Design a protein with these regions (language model features):
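C-terminal scaffold of the Radical SAM
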Residues: 4-5, 9-194, 198
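Basic polycationic patches enriched in arginine
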Residues: 201-202
Length: 203
């Protein structure tokens, strides 16, 4: 979202945005198959602030192909300079039967990283990244309230906390899940069978 697109806040009542930055390193973004750059993210983030959004989350990822502890620290510090209200820090997990897994090979990522001999961080490096996340975010006033989620006081994600408390939530759109009075159900995943958002079924 850029520029005038941010006016959705005034029309829809949306008051929180989440940006999937993942990394401030454009080479790492390319290896993840992301189509945005760090500069694109900065432009959108700035537009969101100018539009009046006062509750913003930024996603970052560690243990990426060819990522180092130093490059990850740079990503964290770049995000912290922006002072978002919430930061989600995830460690990459490569799952079978996903597009990322299918195109995952040592040679591909070595080439993409400019000939680096190592394409995934070691377990020791992953642990250092995890420790760095906790310490650096705590130093800047972010409280860890879930495994991967950190927030300034009062900005914990109500949606996430609601899951743990089994609170009611209604999912809108194709394939969206809901929980109401301890009953889980979800919308159809087929567009042509869903003439109305009320077309749901129990699961």
């Amino acid at each position: 979202l850029v520029g005038s697109e941010m006016c959705i806040r005034d029309r829809s009542g949306i008051n929180r945005l989440s940006f999937g930055l993942q990394s401030a390193n454009n080479q790492e973004l390319k290896m993840l198959g992301r189509i945005h750059s760090y500069e694109d993210f900065l432009e959108s983030y700035d537009a969101a602030r100018k539009a009046g959004f006062e509750n913003i989350n930024v996603d970052v990822m560690s243990a990426l192909p060819a990522q180092t502890v130093i490059s990850y620290e740079i990503t964290l510090k770049n995000v912290l300079r922006l002072k978002p209200e919430h930061i989600s820090a995830y460690s990459l997990m490569i799952e079978k039967d996903t597009p990322f897994y299918e195109r995952y090979s040592e040679d591909e990522y070595i080439r993409a990283a400019g000939g680096k001999p190592k394409y995934l961080p070691s377990e020791e490096e992953e642990r250092r990244m995890y420790k760095l996340t906790k310490e650096l975010l705590a130093e800047h006033g972010y409280n860890r309230y879930e495994i991967s989620n950190y927030a300034r006081e009062g900005y914990e994600c109500k949606h996430n906390v609601g899951y743990w408390r089994r609170e009611n939530y209604i999912g809108m759109g194709i394939g969206a899940s809901s929980l109401f009075e301890n009953t889980r159900f979800h919308n159809t995943c087929l567009l042509y069978t869903s003439p109305s958002p009320r077309d749901m079924r129990r699961s």
